[in-house]
């Protein structure tokens, strides 16, 4: 039997509510030459019946006897995949019709790229928002230092990069498995994002999308592993300053505002001193953007926030237009407290 060029890999656990919509999005793809590998991770709801009713010959359903977890199901799917390209799919998201066609064309034209994501439309909380992530390999690497930069359900992965380097998902993680994999896979291949929304990403009211204490338990060790590339043994104060900047944490002490600004400069200097393991231009842009986001949270400190930001050399590189600068200044002048909206 000929191998299909693409394996669409979708684990599902008790996903009856949105499963059919996710499946229909894949079956409606303009690129038709794929196998659709569905791993039913021991579902106890109506998921097995829905999967059994699917008639498309491209669909293969593998059922786990027990609930093994997302990472284990994904690793199982990677072992079973026949396609040279693995397209990730989640059972509650929706792939737009041209997704596979555009990603396959990009991967075929860029042999050095091992992972390709896309933009996404975030929906499900009563409003829609476009998510844009950096497109180039350099910009993606700069953002990975602070957090995830590829939407998991938009990712297409070259299977050979995984198998040749003995890579897979960390089964000890309950979430952030994708962020962890991207940081490890980036040591072996280039990364890219198509700057076009080709996936609809569903946000759940009670999910762990975004920043929550539960998710931070898994994300923080990944962030600190990235930090140790520049600073092998960071102090507790340095870790605190770093996480404040990564997560745009609202701090209570005015001194912590200055600490975050000083920390951003320190990271820039460390990257230069270490021979630029992170691409200089893109890392500077990412640092300045995160510093602006952090300072913007602290306009209730008044002109202190404005002066600290302005004194920072990074302010000149911050991705903000004149209108944003004026609004930031006005909020500092008025000591606007965003937490009281």
Where are these regions (language model features)?
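Cell-envelope/extracellular polymer assembly enzymes that use nucleotide-activated donors
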Residues: 4-7, 35, 180
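Short, acidic, metal-binding catalytic loop of nucleotide-sugar glycosyltransferases
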Residues: 24-33
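A conserved acidic beta->alpha catalytic loop
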Residues: 40-49, 66, 90
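Glycine-rich, basic loop-to-helix element that forms the pyrophosphate-binding segment
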Residues: 64-81, 102
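Conserved nucleotide-sugar donor-binding catalytic segment
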Residues: 71, 79, 118, 137-245
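Short aromatic/hydrophobic "clamp" motif used to bind/position activated sugar donors
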Residues: 86
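Conserved donor NDP-sugar-binding/catalytic core segment of glycosyltransferases
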Residues: 98-130
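C-terminal subregions of glycosyltransferases and related glycan-biosynthesis enzymes
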Residues: 203-341
